[in-house]
Amino acid sequence: MFKHTLIALTLLAAATLFSLPAFSQEDMTHVPTDAFGKLERPAAVFNHDEHNEKAGIESCNACHHVWVNGVLAEDEDSVGTPCSDCHALEQDGDTPGLQDAYHQQCWGCHEKQAKGPVMCGECHVKN
């Protein structure tokens, strides 16, 4: 009886241990890249909530911004709206192209705060 219980507990522990990485991946945010087609580097991946907590970002519009007639709308955010709805692949007037928009948003903030990754391979990690 003890042998069967020990085997069952060992299998349960192993199943739990091996399932943990799957749960930790749930919170990972993949920067949308469908609009680009074939990529030179992998998409940037980060834990959204952990990033915002560590960076002290409290307002969604710090990253998910809305511009109205060339003015940043302070009380609005674009959560749920793909960046490609406003940013074409190439620059359009004063609106940066999609790749530049991503880079200006992320890299620009990291540079300004002197924190976070700024080298290509730090965000675009090859597996």
UniProtKB/Swiss-Prot annotation:
Q: Which residues bind heme 1?
A: H48, C60, C63, H64
Q: Where is the signal peptide?
A: 1-24
Entry-annotated residues carrying Pyrrolidone carboxylic acid: Q25
Localisation: Periplasm
Has UniProt tagged this entry with the keyword Repressor? no
Write down the InterPro entries for this protein, in alphabetical order.
Answer: c3_cytochr_TmcA, Cyt_c_III, Cyt_c_III_dom, Multihaem_cyt_sf
Q: What does this protein do?
A: Exchanges electrons specifically with the basic cytochrome c3.
This protein's name: Acidic cytochrome c3
